[in-house]
Structures are given as C-alpha cells and as structure tokens.
C-alpha cells in the first residue's frame, strides 16, 4: 500500500512529527542484503537473485536517500553518530555506497557526525570498497567474526574462512580505519571454555579497539531455534555459559580493556558512541526496511519488506507505532542505564523510581544483584551473570 493512502500507524505518529522539538542524537541505516541467511540471525535480510541484484541495489540506494531526505527535513536531524547494520552492509556495491555517502555529505547530514560505523563481514571486505567508505566519512568498522573456529562457524552457518578475518582487518587498517570492533558469539553448541579462550586470543591479536561478545540466543523464527526444537543442537548449559562469561571478563580486564556495558569492552576512551546513545535514552531515527526509531517517547518501525519499501516515496512504510507511557519510559530508562557497567546516578534513580520499583531495587540489592558504588546504582558481578533477568524485574 502506498504511504500516500491512509496509514493508521502514520496517523498515530503524525502528532509526534508535527510537534517534535527533541534533538536527534543518532541515525541507524539498515542495509538488508546478504548472500546467505545465518541460522541464528533474526534481523531482516534478503538474498537477491543474481538476475535482479544490481537493479535492486540501485533502487534501494535511491530510495534510502529519498527516505533520509524526508526524515532529516521532518525532524531537523543533525545526528552525532551513525550506525549502518543489516543484513551485510558491505555486500552493497561500492558505487551504491559512493552515491549514498556523497548524497549525505552534499546534504549536510554528516556535518556533526563524529562516529560513522559500518558493519562488515570478512568475506565482503575489499580494499576498493573500504577506500570508498573511508573517503565518504566512515571512521569505524564492526567486523563480524563471531568465532575463529571453523566448527563453530559451521554451527552458526557462517560461511567465511576464519583466516579471512585477519586479512579483512589488515585491509581495513590500510584503508585508514583506526577504530575497529570485533563481534564474537559465545555459548555456541559444542563450544568449550578453551574454545572461548582461543577466540579471545585471536581477537586480541588483531589489535581490535573494541569487543562485542554476546551469548548465543535462540530467537523465534530462526533456523537455530527450529534445530533446538527438533533436538538437532544441544545448548550450552547455564553453568558453562556463566563460566564462559566470567572467563571473558577476566581476560578482557587483563588485556587492559574497559568493561563499559554488559556485553561490550573497549580500549580506554573508545566505547561505541552510537550504542551509548541507545543506552542513555537518546533519540534516534532509522531508515531502511525494518529500521526502528525512538524519539521523545515514541517508538516506531518500518515495514520489514523490501518490496513495499521500494514502492513508496518520502515517508517510510511504518507498521508499528508505540507511544510510551510515563511508567513505561521510567522502566525503559532504568533498564537501559543499568546495562552500563557504571550504572545510573542514584540521584536520577531517586527522582525516577516509584515505590514499587524502589522495593524491587531494595530486594535485588539484598540478593547481591544490584549495588551502589560511587553514587551509581549498578549490577554486581553476580548480577552481570543474570543481567537480562535482573533488568527484566525493573520493567
């Protein structure tokens, strides 16, 4: 359906757009193209047929620029951080990237940007492409390694040769990328503590400035979830998963990295600014199919389908709009801030938290899952091991 026709979701969002005075802190771009769907991935992605791929890439790039023009004008957005995810952003041809970044520069959308991150898979990294990205303003890359063990990559249905990760990083450095994140996954079926330690050895040997290390989750509507239901994979048990996380904590501290969020570590002074914006309740807009936005208590999501996205112009095909109540916003702010290792200032907690949540904070503190350190409420070391469950109690 064309967005020029009646759209109930858009009608709900219109008051936000018309009256919005909030500053836009970040921009997320979703590039949906992949050459293969990994079995654990629940992000929207498509594998274009070879016969129509080039046309699809060009149509998508033009439509993304069009949507950005609409978003930037409506929200008077001057983002400080941009994150490009997918899909596989580096699967998009260099010419399309050149057109996209040139348009963003010409329109002044990059004027205030201090961090522009692009996700990359090792098998799609070339020097020519990275030269184009860096010339267009990209200054940070997130490398999707996931593991350096061929057995575990096969379990995840990742198709790259683990040796390509080092080569891709070398190319990125030569192109001028001085700020690199490495993505890893632990608690993969069949993975041992020794395997996790070896993955850490490899990641640290790359000289990475940042590490994102998430435990494998079995998301609905993924091949991995189906395999679990059919008994084709055996998940890592909770005790082993906790031991893996404790090993990661110890190894990263020993390597001089700052543990600034439950699943993220950085060299001093190099946390991911875009993700910090999420965790500190910033405002952001998203562009591309399935992209989500969060502005002044409103959340909305673009339709996760390329066809309807390409068929529209201007305002995106929005399918979900949620206006958070004051109660919901308090819960979300508390939950997001407590993902940070520093936590949330106790003065802010006292202002925000109602009696029910204060009782819950006291209970979790008594259970040694929360603590107050230096004027901040934060997760304890014990709380980190069950962070999602603890934070869920505060919603």
Task: Describe the residue ranges of each PLM region.
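A short, conserved structural fragment
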Residues: 365-375
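An alpha-helix initiation/capping motif
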Residues: 242, 354-355, 381-384
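Short, amphipathic alpha-helical interaction segments positioned at domain boundaries
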Residues: 382-395
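Minor-groove-contacting beta-hairpin "wing" of winged helix-turn-helix DNA-binding domains
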Residues: 376-380
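Short amphipathic alpha-helical interaction segments
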Residues: 351-366
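Flexible, acidic/Gly-rich N-terminal and inter-domain linker regions that tether
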Residues: 1-28, 35-36, 61, 367
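C-terminal scaffold of the Radical SAM
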Residues: 17-26, 45-72, 78-353
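Local cysteine-cluster metal-coordination motifs and their immediate loop/turn environment
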Residues: 32-45
């Amino acid at each position: 359906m064309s967005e020029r026709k009646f759209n109930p979701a858009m009608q709900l969002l219109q008051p936000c757009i018309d009256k919005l005075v909030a500053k836009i802190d970040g921009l997320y771009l979703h590039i949906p193209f992949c050459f293969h769907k990994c079995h654990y991935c629940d992000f929207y992605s498509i594998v274009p047929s070879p016969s129509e791929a080039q046309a699809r890439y060009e149509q998508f790039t033009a439509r993304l620029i069009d949507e950005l023009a609409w978003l930037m004008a409506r929200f008077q957005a001057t983002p400080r951080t941009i994150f490009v995810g997918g899909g596989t952003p580096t699967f998009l041809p260099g010419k399309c990237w050149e057109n996209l970044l040139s348009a963003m520069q010409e329109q002044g959308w990059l004027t205030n940007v201090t961090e522009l991150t692009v996700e990359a898979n090792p098998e799609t990294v070339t020097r020519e492409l990275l030269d184009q990205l860096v010339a267009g303003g990209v200054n940070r890359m997130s490398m999707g390694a996931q593991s350096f063990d061929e057995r575990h990559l096969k379990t995840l249905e990742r198709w790259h040769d683990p040796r390509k990760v080092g080569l891709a990083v070398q190319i990125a450095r030569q192109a001028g990328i001085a700020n690199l994140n490495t993505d890893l996954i632990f608690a993969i079926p069949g993975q041992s503590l020794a395997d996790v330690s070896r993955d850490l050895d490899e990641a640290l040997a790359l000289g990475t400035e940042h590490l994102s290390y998430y435990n494998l989750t079995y998301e609905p509507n993924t091949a991995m979830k189906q395999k679990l239901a059919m008994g084709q994979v055996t998940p890592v048990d909770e005790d082993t998963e906790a031991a893996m996380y404790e090993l990661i904590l110890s190894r990263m501290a020993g390597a001089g990295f700052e543990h600034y969020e439950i699943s993220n570590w950085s060299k001093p002074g190099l946390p991911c600014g875009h993700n910090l914006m999420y965790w500190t309740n910033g405002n952001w807009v998203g562009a591309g199919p399935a992209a989500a936005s969060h502005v002044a208590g409103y959340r909305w999501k673009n339709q996760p389908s390329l066809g309807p996205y390409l068929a529209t112009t201007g305002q995106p095909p929005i399918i979900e709009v949620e206006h958070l109540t004051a109660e919901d916003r308090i819960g979300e702010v508390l939950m997001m801030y407590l993902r940070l290792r520093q936590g949330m200032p106790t003065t802010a907690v006292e202002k925000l938290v109602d009696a029910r949540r204060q009782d819950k904070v006291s209970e979790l503190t008594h259970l040694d899952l929360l603590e107050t350190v230096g004027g901040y409420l934060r997760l304890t070391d014990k709380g980190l091991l069950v962070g999602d469950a603890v934070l869920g109690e505060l919603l």
